[in-house]
């Protein structure tokens, strides 16, 4: 039968949902947070999805998307978890491990350090978990890196009180794909237990990195 899949994205995740729905001859609806690039919006629409940029930040857009899904009986495909919604995010995190495996298979030597970017922490948690499983007690030192304007994982680690901590507001950063203010609860269970450090970076560090690369 006909299904409608709905999601919030900064770009790549939503494009993947749109592509998959199109191949399955189903409908995809994609919402993007304020500040999302017009080119990314166009790429998602090119996959046949109904897509638009909201005037909300990422986390508020996720809540809006969830409300629409519940109201209309649509299937929400989100890469972050919350109370009562964990199965699909877990599947997505398991899928992210494919990238970790591909990187691992191409490593000429064992790395000494691993730096992982984090938005809600899903990708970082997946990669951290993969390498912790591969290397066990000899896992490379692993650091989680976030933009200073949206450093919810860093704030949760700094508080160290057993609770998740959010960052609110516009979440302004040039690191658009990482402009997320609320941690994925599943990812934090991994990151909080296995990561060696957490780094909150001002935008100029990302700009300098892009110039170097």
PLM features: what roles do these ranges have?
Residues 31, 54, 79, 145-147:
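Generic beta-sheet signal
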Residues 11:
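Conserved catalytic/binding loops enriched for acidic/polar residues
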Residues 24, 47-48, 72, 138, ...:
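Short, structured coil segments at secondary-structure junctions
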Residues 64, 83-193:
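Glycine-rich phosphate/pyrophosphate-binding loop at beta-loop-alpha junctions
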Residues 183-213:
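Active-site-adjacent helical/loop segments in soluble small-molecule enzymes
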Residues 2-6, 15-68, 152-166, 187:
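Active-site-proximal loop->helix
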């Amino acid at each position: 039968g006909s299904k409608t899949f709905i999601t919030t994205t900064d770009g790549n995740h939503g494009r993947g949902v749109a592509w998959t729905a199109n191949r399955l001859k189903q409908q995809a609806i994609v919402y993007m947070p304020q500040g999302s690039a017009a080119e990314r919006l166009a790429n998602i629409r090119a996959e046949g999805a109904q897509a638009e940029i909201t005037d909300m930040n990422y986390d508020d857009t996720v809540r809006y998307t969830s409300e629409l899904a519940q109201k209309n009986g649509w299937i929400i495909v989100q890469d972050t978890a919350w109370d009562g919604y964990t199965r699909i995010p877990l599947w997505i995190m398991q899928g992210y491990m494919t990238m970790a495996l591909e990187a691992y298979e191409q490593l000429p030597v064992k790395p000494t350090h691993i730096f992982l970017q984090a938005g809600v922490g899903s990708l970082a948690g997946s990669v951290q978990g993969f390498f912790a499983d591969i290397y066990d007690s000899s896992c490379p030192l692993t650091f989680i890196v976030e933009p200073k304007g949206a450093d919810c994982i860093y704030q949760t680690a700094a508080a160290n009180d057993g609770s998740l901590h959010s960052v609110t507001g516009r979440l302004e950063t040039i690191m658009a794909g990482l402009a997320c203010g609320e941690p994925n609860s599943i990812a934090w269970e991994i990151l909080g237990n296995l990561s060696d450090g957490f780094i909150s970076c001002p935008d100029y560090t990302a700009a300098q990195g892009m110039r170097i690369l």
